[in-house]
UniProtKB/Swiss-Prot annotation:
HAMAP family reported for this sequence: NAD_kinase (MF_00361)
Primary role: Involved in the regulation of the intracellular balance of NAD and NADP, and is a key enzyme in the biosynthesis of NADP. Catalyzes specifically the phosphorylation on 2'-hydroxyl of the adenosine moiety of NAD to yield NADP.
GN (gene name): nadK2
Keyword Glycosyltransferase: no
UniProt-recorded name of the protein: NAD kinase 2
Highest taxon of source: Bacteria
Molecular function, one GO term: metal ion binding
Lineage: Bacteria, Bacillati, Bacillota, Bacilli, Bacillales
Keyword ATP-binding assigned: yes
Gene3D superfamilies hit by this protein: Probable inorganic polyphosphate/atp-NAD kinase, domain 1 (3.40.50.10330), Probable inorganic polyphosphate/atp-NAD kinase, domain 2 (2.60.200.30)
Binding site for NAD(+): 50-51, 55, 122-123, 149, 151, 162-167, 186
Catalysed reactions listed for this entry: NAD(+) + ATP = ADP + NADP(+) + H(+)
Originating organism: Listeria monocytogenes serovar 1/2a (strain ATCC BAA-679 / EGD-e)
Length: 267
């Protein structure tokens, strides 16, 4: 099947425009088609860093019927970008010679107040937007697990486990294990509030419900982050999360596994 490519970028600079123009020319020189409609593309390529890649996946609807690829602008390739902007010929050559490999990354599906539905590829986090703590009750499969009080929580996918989650001492999880990891942000533990005090990992058979306590404006304006986006919802009462039914198919080069990237970025 012929490859139809959609290029995504949100940084509008002269340098990026020139690089994108060069990349599009190389693409068409090798016989690939370009489209301005991402719904008609079977390959979606983001130009930028991991943030640009996450934005491209979100703005193109978390499609499962296409391939995604990330092209980095800096020497640091990141977790989602396997290619560098200065390797344009290598990118296309790898495609021509069928040296592209595809990895399937799991997602998290969630709702806010049982209405606002979303997917995340990296992480979901909820924090207080004012200088005070949040009180939340956590339920696993409708069974009460703990009452949390603190700055907030981050719930990450396996690939997202290397981001915010890692900075709060969460574990790095292999993306071959579809799951979601729940990590605390500065929890308060005393005679009244007691939490697990460590991250925990839930399987696709588990559902997590977070109920935000309604006390003294506690749930007025919490900050909600979904990958690289912020969601503004007044009066958040309940968040439901589970391992998503969608997988994102991402192009990678051989000998550049998830753990190769972890070693390159952290060791």
């Amino acid at each position: 099947m012929a490859k139809t490519i959609f290029y995504f970028s949100y940084r509008k600079t002269e340098e990026l425009h020139a690089k994108a123009k060069e990349l599009k020319k190389i693409t068409t020189d090798y016989g690939y088609e370009l489209t301005d409609d991402y719904q008609k593309a079977n390959v979606i390529i983001s130009i930028g860093g991991d943030g640009a890649f996450l934005k491209s996946v979100r703005e193109t609807g978390f499609r499962q019927d296409c391939l995604y690829a990330g092209i980095a602008l800096t020497e640091q390739l990141g977790q989602y970008c396997d290619f560098h902007i200065n390797q344009l010929d290598e990118i296309i050559k790898a495609a021509i010679e069928d040296r592209w490999l595809v990895r399937r990354y799991p997602t998290i599906y969630g709702t806010v107040n049982n209405t606002k539905a979303f997917y995340v590829l990296n992480e979901f986090n909820i924090r207080s937007s004012i200088i005070r703590t949040l009180t939340m009750d956590l339920y696993i499969n409708d069974s009460h697990f703990e009452t949390f009080r603190g700055d907030g929580m981050v719930i990450s996918t396996p690939t997202g486990s290397t981001a915010y989650n890692k900075s709060v001492n969460g574990s790095i999880v292999d993306p071959l294990l579809p799951s979601m990891q729940v990590s605390e942000l500065a929890s308060i533990n005393n005679n009244k509030f007691r939490t697990l005090g460590s991250s925990f990992i839930l399987s696709p058979k588990r559902k997590l419900r977070i109920e935000i306590a309604s006390e003294e404006g506690n749930n007025e304006f919490p900050m909600i982050g979904m990958d690289s986006e912020a969601l503004s919802i007044q009066h958040v009462h309940e968040v439901n999360l589970e391992v998503g039914d969608r997988f994102i198919n991402i192009i990678k080069l051989p000998k550049n596994s998830f753990w190769d990237k972890v070693k390159r970025n952290f060791l």
